[in-house]
């Protein structure tokens, strides 16, 4: 699972 969905601001904000 990609954490980008829950904390997109922390992981790049792309998702």
Swiss-Prot record:
Highest taxon, organism lineage: Eukaryota
Keyword Endoplasmic reticulum on entry: no
Tissue expression pattern: Expressed by the venom gland.
Cellular compartments annotated: Secreted
Major localisation: secreted
Entry GO CC: extracellular region
GO MF annotation list: toxin activity
This protein's UniProt keywords: Neurotoxin, Secreted, Toxin
Assigned protein family: Belongs to the scolopendra toxin 2 family.
Name of the protein this chain belongs to: Scolopendra 4722.07 Da toxin
Organism from which the protein derives: Scolopendra angulata (Barbados giant red centipede)
